[in-house]
Amino acid sequence: MFEEFIRQYFVQTGLGWAAAGAMLTVMFGGVGSALGIRVAASEAAGVLSEKPELFGKLLILMALPGTQGFYSFIGAIFIASRTGLMGGAVTVPPIVGVALLFVGIGQGIVEWRSAIYQGETSAAAINLVAKRPDEAGRAIIMPALVETYAVVALLAAILMTLWLTNSSLTVANPLAAGA
């Protein structure tokens, strides 16, 4: 029974590989976002204990590291929708499934690390707002710069998924050229 599962989803089709890639991107992005929010919220809690009136200004800075989890989810849904995971015909060959596994891992790692870095940058911005509340608008710019690379990873994952699942994609056999 297990052998049949492996054969159907990993050998005959690449659906299992693609599903693993989709889940890994969600896992990495979700863990990174949770850690990033923890860093920012911990810093904000200290500030709010003395200046509770800053809650509205600090809320955005606390929430910013959570966007990577959403970007990972979008990447996973995109993989799932292009491979037959969400219904329809399974059209992904094993080699494309493996490639999508690496797309998911790549996006997931960038989302994971950028969420943590964004949490650290948000914590620094929270300290700025604590000392100079009128600088809240400028303080948001610092963690938003880290966000740029999370968006780049999402766009790269979407483009790679589109290219890899293009039905007109043909794979050349380099061994046949020398024969």
Residue ranges and their predicted role:
Residues 1-179:
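Hydrophobic, small-residue-rich transmembrane alpha-helices and their short perimembrane loops
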